[in-house]
Amino acid sequence: MSILATEKEKEFMIVNMGPHHPSMHGVLRLIVTLDGEDVIDCEPILGYLHRGMEKIAENRTIIQYLPYVTRWDYLATMFTEAITVNGPEQLGNIRVPKRASYIRVIMLELSRIASHLLWLGPFMADIGAQTPFFYIFRERELVYDLFEAATGMRMMHNYFRIGGVAADLPYGWIDKCLDFCDYFLTGVAEYQKLITRNPIFLERVEGVGIIGGEEAINWGLSGPMLRASGIEWDLRKVDHYECYDEFDWEVQWQKEGDSLARYLVRIGEMTESVKIIQQALEGIPGGPYENLEIRCFDRESDPERNDFENRFISKKPSPTFELTKQELYARVEAPKGELGIFLIGDQSGFPWRWKIRPPGFINLQILPQLVKRMKLADIMTILGSIDIIMGEVDR
């Protein structure tokens, strides 16, 4: 009787995991309730990186706000820039030149590769494999060299503009990028050889954190989290934005819904991104890299613009882009899922409402359900397979 009584009276252990260091998964805190090694409950605590990004947007013009958006998901900044200019472009029915659209696709896919690489390294380190963590920086550095040559910045690029991009591709950049694509395919093959069939890796990820297709839809998951559960859904195919329809590529998806499936989806996406980049580089058309019509100046209404002091275009600020009085939801397929903004204009230069739909925030909601009845060591495997960046989770 005394043994049974002590079993009923035993208390669970509550452990704080985090707040983690910003260089890994971001400043996330998990309050984990344990029964020995078994996880009974897990409560994520968010908000350590909240900076009021939505409110800041409502007090800035689009051009002023562009440098801020690169701080949401700071590992895939091209996507946050893309969604920031896509919304106003759709509101104003602004046509983007074909060359600018091709440049955007190239930059977006390079950014997807860089994001997936910096997911792969820490994910493998979390589950005990240190070697790939050093390998991924080798390829990622080459991507950042390409970004720096084209945009002037390695990470916070501030490259997209309403109606196009800030600058054309420099001389020799296309050949350099094609060389990178050829080299990177051998790098992906090396990762697959090193990781995919490794028995220790499979022991840690196979059958861990399983999500069914219907369950993934009900939770609102997107990106690799959704595609790894057997749902073939990619906004590049669904929404036909930019010029993705002009390229031959396949949506990567798996049926199993576990951490291994999410790994395989992301590895496959890196290969498909290279295919898209190669086709875009080989077929990139000539012409302007931005829609110059929306930057025309009204000479008659402001004659002071044209006097001697202001005759150089560099001294003339871009006209304030006016957001028409309507509402719009725009979205792109970011590396972590569906990144969207709900935008309401009110006939002024500032948005009346700027609602951000971050994929990481919504994908993170399923974490407590996935880790229940799992072992303590599986928490980092499942959290790593979700792929979150707290900059966009907390905004």
Swiss-Prot record:
It is an enzyme of class 7 (translocase). NDH shuttles electrons from NAD(P)H:plastoquinone, via FMN and iron-sulfur (Fe-S) centers, to quinones in the photosynthetic chain and possibly in a chloroplast respiratory chain. The immediate electron acceptor for the enzyme in this species is believed to be plastoquinone. Couples the redox reaction to proton translocation, and thus conserves the redox energy in a proton gradient. NDH is composed of at least 16 different subunits, 5 of which are encoded in the nucleus. It is a peripheral membrane protein. This is NAD(P)H-quinone oxidoreductase subunit H, chloroplastic. Its EC number is 7.1.1.-. The keyword Transferase does not apply. GO terms for biological process: photosynthesis, light reaction. It comes from Citrus sinensis (Sweet orange). PANTHER family: NADH DEHYDROGENASE [UBIQUINONE] IRON-SULFUR PROTEIN 2, MITOCHONDRIAL, NADH-UBIQUINONE OXIDOREDUCTASE 49 KDA SUBUNIT. It holds the Pfam family Complex1_49kDa. GO terms for cellular component: chloroplast thylakoid membrane.
